[in-house]
Amino acid sequence: MRANSPTQGISLKMHQARPLFLVTVALQLIGLGYSYQSEGDGAREVSNILSPVIPGTTLDRTLSNSSRKNDIPEGARLWDSLPDSSTLGESAVPVSRCCHNGGTCVLGSFCVCPAYFTGRYCEHDQRRRDCGALGHGAWTLHSCRLCRCIFSALYCLPHQTFSHCDLKSFLSSGARGSRECSIPSLLLLVLCLLLQGVAGKG
């Protein structure tokens, strides 16, 4: 076998380009973090992208069966508050049996769910997916927390520290930060492609 085979050359070139790619990704993440931190209260107005407007009573009516714990708004659940959960939307194993809604427990660890039910413990009814006016999978800002509607339950991200709880300024800060980072990111990408092309010819 020859020492300088074509596949070895390609492998070496890819190995040389990998650090450039990692540096590019790291710089983009750092830039996004700085743009979020440097935003002020003078955020620009967002023009008409906030539809539909969700009144608080719509979600409260739909999710009124949840309890209020540790200053968590009623109808919202924290993702990190699920004790035995590694994925979004799972709940802890029920004390009496492992399955809800008539599911069949198999080997004490998973469930065979009847029609219209899904989830590890058959806890999600596929016929009830929306949170009032908020559709399944949609994100919203609820009581200064970023929340997502999943199978008619509102799950909220924990420990968010916003300087303000205004949805318009929150959305405009993300849009402004991504525009500020787009030109340097594009230049860095072009530089990496040029360096990869030069390394490929050499």
From Swiss-Prot:
Disruption phenotype: Positional defects in internal organs. The lung presents a right pulmonary isomerism. The stomach is located on either the left or the right and the spleen is small and has an abnormal shape. The apex of the heart pointed to the right or left. In addition malpositioning of heart outflow tracts is observed, the aorta is connected to the right ventricle and emerged from the heart in a ventral position and to the right of the pulmonary artery. This one is connected to either the left or the right ventricle. PROSITE patterns: EGF_1 (PS00022), EGF_3 (PS50026). InterPro entries: Cryptic/Cripto_CFC-dom, EGF-like_dom. Residues 94-123 form the EGF-like domain. A lipid is attached at D166 (GPI-anchor amidated aspartate). It is a lipid-anchor; GPI-anchor. Disulfide bonds join C98-C105, C99-C111, C113-C122. Belongs to the EGF-CFC (Cripto-1/FRL1/Cryptic) family. This is Cryptic protein. It comes from Mus musculus (Mouse). The lineage of its organism: Eukaryota, Metazoa, Chordata, Craniata, Vertebrata. The gene is Cfc1.
